[in-house]
Amino acid sequence: MNLDFSDDQKFLQAEAKKFLEKENSVNRSRNVLDTDQNLDKELWSKIVELGWTGIRIPEEYGGLGLGHLELCVIAEELGRYLAPVPFSSSVYLFTEAIIKYADEEIKKEILPKLISGEVVGTLAVTEDFHAPSKENIITEVSSDLVNGKKIGVPDAQVSTHSILVTKSENGINLRLIDHAHQSVTIEHQQNIDESRGHFSIECNDTPSKLIGGETNGWELYESIINQAAVLFSFEQIGGSQASLDMSINYAKERYAFGRPIGSFQAI
């Protein structure tokens, strides 16, 4: 049984690696840390032009209609080069929720705009410093109006929309909101890694649209997160491999006592 990536998937990964290396993505990430933008707009625009944001989106909406393995190889290279773009929040989380659970009207409205970059999305669940669970969701929705505050939302400032995990009289819901509405307030929150900014989102009677069912929102959220965990793992594989490669190269180039330090048993 061959569990390796296909030739097409390997080619896609090689092209992604070549692109991100050429764009000097690691240095771009350093530059982002020195600003308050939390995004390299130029790099993000080029990624959108390459069609990466439409990898999982079905062809009928203008996407490439590819599978998760294609997304995995892209994720590995994004992690390898620490790309300062909202790819994970918008593609792994937001786009996947729209593809799998939104109604046809929302799909037709949102998916083509995700491909073009007109829409950038994120997913908001956490409300306090405890692990999120359906028992501690406080943000409420009534008559399609959302009230409450989410914290630790990745890339919220650069996103145009978000999907919120909310509570209604029927149970836990997933709700789509537009950040352009005047009732939405987004504020930056300090965190350890500013290359991927995190923010709070506060809603005060914010209009929303239902994603999925009225009562099974938590199960849908868990499905999205479990799937995204694989993609985040591929990002970590890419980052770990880059660290290992740097260490090996240093051990070959650094000399001590007239020989490369990599030749010493301790190294």
Residue ranges with predicted function:
Residues 3-12, 80, 186-267:
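Glycine-rich beta->alpha junctions and the first turn(s) of the following alpha-helix
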Residues 133-147:
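Cytochrome P450 C-terminal beta-domain/meander region
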Residues 48-108, 112-117, 154-161:
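Internal helix-loop-helix
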Residues 9, 20, 74, 103, ...:
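Residue-level signal for inorganic ion chemistry
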Residues 116-128, 164:
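A short, Trp-centered hydrophobic/proline-enriched beta-strand micro-motif
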Residues 27-49:
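Short secondary-structure junction/hinge motifs that connect adjacent elements
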Residues 65-74, 133-136, 177, 203-206:
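Structural signature of FAD isoalloxazine-binding scaffolds in flavoprotein oxidoreductases
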Residues 124, 147-184:
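A short core secondary-structure module
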